[in-house]
Design a protein with these regions (language model features):
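A short, conserved beta-to-alpha structural element at the edge of catalytic cores
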Residues: 44-53, 57, 161-182
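Substrate-recognition "cap/lid" segment bordering the active-site pocket of phosphatases
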Residues: 93-140, 150
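Short catalytic/ligand-binding loop motif for oxyanion handling, primarily in non-cytosolic enzymes
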Residues: 26-29, 34, 89-91, 98-102, ...
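Active-site neighborhood of HAD-like aspartate-dependent phosphohydrolases
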Residues: 6-60, 155
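Substrate-recognition element of Asp-dependent hydrolases with the DxDx(T/V) motif
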Residues: 68-70, 75-106, 112
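Acidic, Mg2+-coordinating phosphoryl-transfer loop and its flanking beta/alpha structural elements
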Residues: 140-176
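Charge-dense, intrinsically disordered terminal/linker segments
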Residues: 1-16, 24, 36, 71, ...
Length: 185
């Protein structure tokens, strides 16, 4: 379904919004760069090896890495906008792959308890985000920074919004377009 079609029919049910964590609300990439003593994660020589090292380090190291992520200002603005406009949302975040995935999920829940406490009870942790793209035949919305998840979401019939913390205004403008018909009901 196209965004214009969704907006044309104001009798439709409001699409549910799913909000990513890492790279949207929590500064995974800044922490990952710091862990490797580089200014930007793109300077990590072999990112696949680096993520595998974290994934197989120890449950404590994985937990501490995710629990200590700094909140991103742009993600905070998105959450604030959603709350101001009474847009229900669920956090939808992928756990770290590997043997300590559970430790990453526990850390993410604890992070949410501190930084976005109302989101914890409905948070979903899965590598298969695209399974939430539709509610029956109606599209849901995903705000994410990772192209792979956005493409899978769109291909499954959902509405994908690419978030960049440096351009939060774009994310909010896209949300305004989608949710405008539902804001003054």
């Amino acid at each position: 379904m196209k965004l214009t079609e969704l907006m044309a029919d104001t009798n439709k049910k409001m699409p549910h919004l799913y909000l990513d964590m890492d790279g949207v609300q929590a500064d995974f990439f800044g922490a990952w760069a710091a862990k490797h003593n580089v200014g930007n994660y793109k300077e990590i020589p072999d990112t696949e090896t680096a993520i595998n090292e974290l994934a197989t380090s120890s449950p404590e190291e994985v937990y501490n890495f995710f629990r200590e992520l700094k909140p991103l200002q742009g993600g905070g603005k998105v959450v604030q906008w959603l709350n101001q406009h009474n847009i229900p949302y669920s956090v939808l975040s992928a756990p770290l792959r590997g043997p300590y995935a559970k430790a990453s999920v526990e850390a993410k829940k604890d992070w949410l308890d501190e930084h976005n406490p109302n989101a914890t009870p409905n948070a979903i942790f899965t590598q298969h985000k695209h399974k939430y793209a539709l509610n029956g035949s109606e599209p849901n919305v995903l705000v994410d920074d990772y192209g792979k998840y956005l493409n899978l979401w769109s291909n499954a019939g959902g509405i994908a919004i690419k978030h960049e913390d440096s351009n939060t205004e774009h994310t909010i403008k896209e949300l305004e377009k989608i949710y405008a018909p539902y804001l003054n009901r």
